[in-house]
Amino acid sequence: MNDDNQQSAHDVDASGSLVSDTHHRRLSGAQKLIVGGVVLALSLSLIWLGGREKKENGDAPPSTMIATNTKPFHPAPIDVTLDPPAAQEAVQPTAPPPARSEPERHEPRPEETPIFAYTSGDQGTSKRVQQGETDRRREGNGEDSPLPKVEVSAENDLSIRMKPTELQPTRATLLPHPDFMVTEGTIIPCILQTAIDTSLAGYVKCVLPWDVRGTTNNVVLLDRGTTVVGEIQRGLQQGDARVFVLWDRAETPDHAMISLASPSADELGRSGLPGTVDNHFWQRFSGAMLLSVVQGAFQAASTYAGSSGGGTSFNSVQNNGEQTADTALKATINIPPTLKKNQGDTVSIFVARDLDFSGIYQLRMAGRAARGRDRRP
């Protein structure tokens, strides 16, 4: 029994509430004062913060609302000064016109000022603004006509190639004396009387083997046996295989002379005279080759002497041999080639200008026609 009473005294009501318990619901007087003070302090803090915000808002300057410009854009008017009228002769004195008062300058209003709109979506407004700015510039410059169009050049490779070369026209003329003319471009064969050696510049001579006739092929102008003198102005250079000869003048057996000033050619009319070319290979490289052989011998000797411990003197001799070979090669490497052509070879004269013999030759009638003309009274 005692155990049962003791267990019932200490059992806790599981369904009961600790807050509603009589022991926990009662507060002491000191605790009540503390709770009341905390609540009062919080209330005063909230009231003080609210009054401070109202004071700050009252001290701030009032904000002004910017009115939106909804009127359409109008360009600002521009004052155009008219040119003064031309002075006219006064017939009688007249009273001077009253002084015109200067017009008051029109100050553009805010809605008349140009507006630059930069929008990504409304492209129509931007185009209207740009058009209005363009119109204002045209009015300021006094232009009523549309803006000039910029012409784009259409030049290209095809159009340039389609343009023909414009040459000056030439007028045809007749030869004044065709019987006594040897025209430009005529090729005259000639046989060399002197051999050619281009080691030095000099003169050459040839003889015409046939008669040379005029343009009509009726009159002999240069008889067979006419001698022609030419000159070699310079020798050959490295790589040349022909020599240039300039024929100066021709002299006929009747001692008629004419200046030619025409270049030489071969039998087929190719410029220059061919011949046997001597490049002087051994003269140019024989000394260097000999010195190279000697230098190789000294190098072998220096190698042998170096193995035996006495190669100092041989090395100095080898270096001197290299310098001597270089000097000999530089002295002989620039020897020019020489062309030789035998006496009696056939060459050609390419006539470079018209030859006129009308000053020394004349035509006269011969045979029966001449005798019949002489018998006429």
From Swiss-Prot:
One matching Pfam family is TrbI
> What's the main place this protein lives?
membrane
- Region: Disordered; residue ranges are 53-152
Write down the InterPro entries for this protein, in alphabetical order: T4SS_VirB10/PtlG (IPR047695), T4SS_VirB10/TraB/TrbI (IPR005498), T4SS_VirB10/TrbI (IPR042217)
Q: Which locations, inside or outside the cell, does it occupy?
A: Cell inner membrane
Q: Where is the composition biased (Polar residues)?
A: 120-132
Q: Name one GO molecular function term.
A: identical protein binding
State any GO BP term from the record: protein secretion by the type IV secretion system
Q: Which UniProt keywords apply?
A: Cell inner membrane, Cell membrane, Crown gall tumor, Membrane, Plasmid, Transmembrane, Transmembrane helix
Biased-composition ranges, Basic and acidic residues, are 101-112
Membrane spanning segments where? 33-50
One GO cellular component assignment for this chain's record is: type IV secretion system complex
Functional note? VirB proteins are suggested to act at the bacterial surface and there play an important role in directing T-DNA transfer to plant cells.
Q: Which NCBIfam families match?
A: PRK13855.1, T4SS_VirB10
The family line of this record is: Belongs to the TrbI/VirB10 family.
Q: What is this protein called?
A: Protein virB10
**Organism of provenance:** Agrobacterium fabrum (strain C58 / ATCC 33970)
Q: According to the entry, what is the taxonomic lineage of the organism?
A: Bacteria, Pseudomonadati, Pseudomonadota, Alphaproteobacteria, Hyphomicrobiales
